[in-house]
Amino acid sequence: MAPSRRTFIHQLTSAGTLSVMTPVLSQFEIKQTKIKPMNNKIGFNLLAWSAIVSDELFPIVERLQKIGYDGVECAMDAREKSAYQRFGKHAHDLGLEVTCVLAVGPEENPIDGSLNIRQKSLDRIKWAIDRAHDMEAKVICGPFHSAFATFTGQPPTEKEYVRSAEVLRQAGEYAAQAEVTLTLEAINRFECYLCNTMGQLVGLVERVSHPNVKAMYDTHHANMEEKKFKMSINKVSPVLGHVHISENDRGTPGDGHVLWDETFASLAAHQYNGWLTIEAFTRNDPKFANAINVWREFSPTWEMAENGLNFIQNMCIKHKL
């Protein structure tokens, strides 16, 4: 049974105050000298702390900047416009860029049979584009091709791909006006059914056929759904617009069993020059953690940020990315 908007999406986007504030800088950060990859910017997804865009994230953003990140990624929640404007200004004042992540629920499902619900999905995506524009963000990523954790008990149908493409094509037109790129995410079979693999995702992006609608690659989901990392990156590379660096357990990148050398070598072979953004999860925001079934701490939060950045930089150097 599909979760209601109140019980799922509101959990994603209506979590409370931060439960873990920023401690003093570690010796890692004091000694860290930023090694810039040749072409790629490195970001960190703030869902590790909160699903809410608010001023409470400012100290965290400041510390991420001191560690050496190029940008931060925030969730698109239902807060007022001014919260996004303040957040964007604070990030840009620190010299950081912003990217965004969006999910939609069953009441805003782009593949629903109801035209009214599909219109609500388009309105929701347009709202997110407006908020991205408020923050001067250029990328919105996420699995908003269909509703998160909403299932019919059947495989995806041709009609559902057609409906999704129609909504996303209109969203792409709107995004172009704001100079925003929508990067769609294939996620695992336990969280959606429309796009689990790069093959399905590329097929959808090609149906949309709009320059402001591209694909993203998430290593966590690829580790579950793809036969080979190299083959899946080869498949998505012509339409690839964003990458999430995420370990198999959602902990510190490099500490698990994702095939990182194969991943970075394949990205380098295709001269990928977009964002490499760490997406790692914690229980710092209990409502969000419960909504995505995170029941334990995979790694200390700041260890994920510190060691994750160092890991990506070293992999970029190793594979000349």
Locate the predicted segments by residue.
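Histidine-acidic metal/acid-base catalytic patches
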Residues: A2-G43, S50, D55-Q65, K138, ...
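Active-site acidic/histidine proton-transfer and metal-coordination neighborhood
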Residues: L12-T22, K34, N116-K214, S299-E303, ...
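Active-site-proximal loop/turn and secondary-structure-junction residues that shape catalytic pockets
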Residues: A48-S50, M76-A78, V104-P106, S146-F148, ...
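Conserved dinucleotide-binding and phosphotransfer motif residues
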Residues: I67, L94, A178, H270
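Structural motif corresponding to the early beta-alpha repeats
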Residues: D70, C74-R169, N273, T277-K287, ...
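Acidic-residue sensor for enzyme active/binding pockets
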Residues: E73, E185, E191, E226, ...
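Catalytic-core regions built around general acid/base machinery
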Residues: R86-L94, Q170-A175, S232, E262-S266
